Amino acid sequence: PGVAPAEREVSVTVGQVDLLATLADVTGATVPANAGEDSVSFLPLLRGDAAWRPAREGVVHHSADGRFAIRAGKWKLLLWPGSGGWSSPTPTPSRWLPVEATDLSTLPKYQLYDLESDLAERHNVADAHPEVVQRLGRLLRRYIEDGRSTPGPAQPVDRTI
C-alpha cells in the first residue's frame, strides 16, 4: 500500500521465483550469491518504474516432473513433449489429477507457444519457428550450465537437458 500505483498493467515477464528477491529488497535483506539464483527483484515495477527490465533474458520454469521450460518475451519453449506432470499429457497416471497415461513418443519433442496469441498453449508452433526454438534452447542450456539465470557466480547444478 502506498508504494504501487493502483490498477496498473505492465508487460514485463516476472515469475513466482522473483518473489524471493523482491521481498528481500522490500525488507532490506541480502540474498546470498548461492540462493535465489533465478530470482530478480521487481520492486522497481511496483514503485512505478515502467522502464525497468530484469537482468535476465528469460524466466526458467521447472515442472513437477523435473522438466525444463523457458519464457522470453511472447515465447514459451518446453523441452518435453508432455505437460510436466500436473495434467495431460503425462507418461504416468497423475497422483493429483484424474488423467490417463500418454505414450509421449507420439508427441513432438519440443513445444513452442506464442503466448500473445495463444495463452492457453493449444497450438505448438515449434516447427514454424525453428530459430526461436534454437535461440531459447541455447539460452536455457546456458542458464542450466551456469546454475543461474541472473548475474553472479556460477552455481553447482544437479540437472542437465
List where the protein language model places each region.
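Substrate-binding rim/cap in mid-to-C-terminal beta-strand-loop elements of soluble/periplasmic
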Residues: 1-52, 123
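Glycine-rich phosphate/pyrophosphate-binding beta-alpha loops
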Residues: 63
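Residue-level detector of beta-strand structural context in well-folded domains
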Residues: 66-68
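Long, internal low-complexity/basic segments
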Residues: 19, 72, 83-85, 91-111, ...
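WW-domain-binding short linear motifs
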Residues: 57-60
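C-terminal helix-and-tail extensions that cap enzymatic domains
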Residues: 45, 55, 160-161
